[in-house]
Design a protein with these regions (language model features):
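Asp-based, Mg2+/Mn2+-dependent phosphohydrolase catalytic module
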Residues: 1-11, 21-24, 112, 118, ...
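N-terminal helical cap/lid subdomain that shapes the substrate entry/recognition surface
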Residues: 3-115, 127
Length: 221
């Protein structure tokens, strides 16, 4: 990962498609689990199609509103679209499914996109740069993503991690970038132009950061 970061005091990183990418087996296994867990009559192809549709739609809505659609809301939308009577499914059932999904996620872990990520973070922190994670979420909650970063031994490099499901805002909303700025200023005095946000999404990451007043690096993989 090539980033010109020397002139900044703090670097903020997106997570998905910036630092990690999905394990191709995970979504297949998750969709099969969804079908079996909720005893859905539809074909696997149909289940996969509907899950994908609401995954993309949820991300698009979050970017448009700047808010965060809850994972369980997405589950209910998918179940309803697959002709399941959601009146018969309480949130405890959804919670059980999420825990099984999280276990599957850690079994079929996302991969680090850049093998030298840990080395880069070490270099940054050695130069007294501080770093954080700022990520929108959908099907996988922030608490599970924290476990993934711990698995890759990256947690200690981050001063903090902010996930949309935990704060109720999504990029490119100014509010979530404000949370980053406020958190940075709890441990150092920093101006907006001293902060670089790195991400792959031109709307959520690049435009959002620039509009707020940070500098931004659009990562192209």
């Amino acid at each position: 990962m090539k980033i010109e970061y020397k002139k900044y005091t703090h670097i903020s990183f997106d997570l998905w498609l910036t630092l990690i990418k999905s394990n191709p087996e995970f979504k297949k296994k998750r969709n099969l689990l969804f079908k079996n867990f909720f005893e859905i009559d539809s074909t696997m192809d149909k289940v996969s199609e509907v899950v994908r549709y609401y995954d993309v739609l949820g991300n698009n809505i979050n970017e448009k509103t700047g808010l965060n659609i809850d994972t369980y809301e997405l589950y209910y939308l998918i179940l309803s679209a697959l002709q399941v009577d959601i009146a018969k499914i309480d949130t405890d059932k959804l919670s059980q499914f999420y825990e099984e999904t999280a276990a599957l996620f850690m079994e079929y872990k996302p991969e680090l996109i850049f093998p030298d990520t840990k080395k880069l973070f070490q270099e940054m922190t050695n130069e007294d740069k501080s770093i954080n994670i700022l990520s929108n979420t959908a099907f996988i909650k922030g608490r599970t993503l924290r476990k993934l970063l711990a698995h890759y031994e990256l947690t200690d490099y981050f001063k903090f991690q902010i996930y949309s499901d935990e704060v109720g805002f999504s990029k490119p909303n100014n509010e979530i970038f404000q949370l980053v700025f406020d958190e940075i200023n709890t441990f150092k005095s920093a101006q907006k132009k001293e902060i670089l946000h790195v991400g792959d999404n031109s709307v959520a990451d690049y435009n959002g950061a620039i509009r707020f007043g940070f500098d931004a690096h659009l990562l192209k993989i």
